């Protein structure tokens, strides 16, 4: 609680979190969820547009194909954005990268807003690709920016705010997409274009806030700018100790250049970090949480929830993830990262198993549908308290300043690739396994919990230098000398 009070007292840091989040991971969650409400309206618009051009309506299977393209272009854009994030973070800095990233949102909002008037569903497709690029960049750079700007005792909580804004974006998108608001047949272009609002808020607020002190000192070599940023972020406290830590980290990175993504896989000194990033990053996307959202509507419908009320029940699922993200942010610096990950995956295994049994027994015992409905909420709560937020800060905490942008690129690209694969494969898994569709996902949850327990070191309350030393000891258990991956040549550039 002392750390939480310090966060509240550090008003500039709190404002930085809000400004980065509203135009960052909030956009990811918001654009992920708002596309669900106008599904039928956009399909009708696509069919009508095609008929106006050719004189013939589109066959049903082609309408579905067009819709699948509109949905799938979002994660594809996210993949491009993730690959763009590393070079942007190094060339422009963390803060400027987030600001420049809004170009994609503004362009997409214009395309969405005028798509119906122009009679072009292609504008919707291009807009979805652009908001995907925006999400891919922000999902990587925001945790990096906030993790580098926070003091070590608040680093986990501050970085976890990315998960809070993602969940908040999902809920806000579900609310704005209600039929009573912008989810109607006439307002859907405004619904899609509403992503401009959080982008405008970030453009108005983030320029007034400081850049990452670590970037200013280690990448730019500007001690005065670093000290000025620290003074604004920390207030009137003593900065000597933190500045000394930053100087030590700068000395450790002296003579090094920024790592390229493929170089992370070539060095034994980064073996455990990269393995943890790949295993736990894949587990977060393959654990079945996104599939729970996809399956929720049918479970609520079978449980007797009126069709008109299902949209409100879906908002409840998003609210669960938001609630647990807030709880996780509060407790992460008390219980640590490992406990949240192990506990989250273990609880997901438990609730997923009960959910599978409930689906199998629904024909014999109708009341098990209510049990399945409860398991959906419990599964989402368990995901939100652990994997949803903690996984996102691994790239920031496990890698040093020179490897961090490349690690974020790898983590982000992996996340979007897995999201695409799950989106493509889930319908076939559902058809092939029926009520047992969650068995593969449960296996992933078990593996995630076991890997965390055996191989992931705790980073709570440690400086980046302390984390690097511990990981070096784990990667080279029989050797005590300094890291072997440092270059002897002094390289001024940090270009990827």
From Swiss-Prot:
Glycosylation positions in this chain: 47
CDD domains associated with the record: MFS_GLUT_Class2
GO molecular-function terms, A-Z: D-glucose transmembrane transporter activity; fructose transmembrane transporter activity; sugar transmembrane transporter activity
Extracellular side: 33-61, 119-128, 179-187, 295-311, 360-364, 430-435
Residue ranges crossing the lipid bilayer per the database entry: 12-32, 62-82, 98-118, 129-149, 158-178, 188-208, 274-294, 312-332, 339-359, 365-385, 409-429, 436-456
Alphabetic keyword roster: Cell membrane, Glycoprotein, Membrane, Sugar transport, Transmembrane, Transmembrane helix, Transport
Protein's cellular compartments: Cell membrane
SUPFAM superfamilies per UniProt: MFS general substrate transporter (SSF103473)
Any GO BP: dehydroascorbic acid transport
Bilayer topology term: Multi-pass membrane protein
Tissue specificity statement from the Swiss-Prot or TrEMBL entry: Expressed in heart and skeletal muscle.
CC annotations in GO: cell junction; nucleoplasm; plasma membrane
PROSITE patterns per UniProt: MFS, SUGAR_TRANSPORT_2
InterPro entries documented for this protein: GLUT, MFS_dom, MFS_sugar_transport-like, MFS_trans_sf, Sugar/inositol_transpt, Sugar_transporter_CS
Topological domains annotated Cytoplasmic: 1-11, 83-97, 150-157, 209-273, 333-338, 386-408, 457-496
A UniProt-annotated Pfam family: Sugar_tr
Reaction equations catalysed: D-glucose(out) = D-glucose(in)
Function recorded in the entry: Facilitative glucose transporter.
Similarity comment text for this entry: Belongs to the major facilitator superfamily. Sugar transporter (TC 2.A.1.1) family. Glucose transporter subfamily.
Name by which UniProt lists this protein: Solute carrier family 2, facilitated glucose transporter member 11
Species of provenance: Homo sapiens (Human)
Upper taxonomic lineage: Eukaryota, Metazoa, Chordata, Craniata, Vertebrata
